[in-house]
Design a protein with these regions (language model features):
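N-terminal secretory signal peptides that target proteins for export/translocation
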Residues: 1-7
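Flexible, solvent-exposed loop/hinge segments and secondary-structure transition points
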Residues: 8-14, 23-137
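Repetitive helical segments and hydrophobic/amphipathic motifs
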Residues: 17-18
Length: 137
């Protein structure tokens, strides 16, 4: 009888510890989305906009922000068509450079001809990244 009580007690303690561990892990689900390197914030949209799709899939970016101004936007690994993605990188990503976060959120950037879906996806990634920055800086 005592053995059963001890076993139940051990099981309850183990279950409680597991629940606590899961709770703590889920509390920091946004870890890695925004980091700070010296005085520059870096927002990575890989998790933040994982549902945003270009022509072939997700189009995550890293947004570098210093003094509330966008320094640069870096394209991260994706499955977009290389020819079209090269156009997006060359013609679209630098459009936000030098803008304040608020101005960038209000600016309507044109899509790149021939890479419309990829362009729209990048624009949405940038929007979500900047909104996240504003809420969490």
């Amino acid at each position: 009888m005592k053995k059963n009580k001890d076993m139940k007690k051990t099981l309850m303690l183990s279950a409680s510890a597991l629940c606590m561990a899961l709770l703590l892990m889920s509390a920091k689900g946004d870890e890695g989305i925004m980091t700070k390197e010296k005085s520059t914030y870096v927002v990575n949209t890989t998790q933040l906009a994982s549902d945003v799709r270009g022509f072939q899939g997700a189009t995550p970016v890293k947004i570098y922000i210093k003094g509330n101004k966008i320094q640069s936007i870096e394209a991260l690994s994706n499955d977009e068509t290389p020819k079209h993605w090269a156009k997006v990188k060359k013609l679209l990503l630098e459009k936000w450079n030098g803008l304040t976060v608020d101005k960038a959120l209000k600016t309507e950037v044109d899509v790149v001809t021939g890479a419309t879906l990829s362009s729209k996806a990048v624009k949405e990634n940038v929007k979500r990244g900047l909104e996240y920055y504003k809420k969490n800086k």
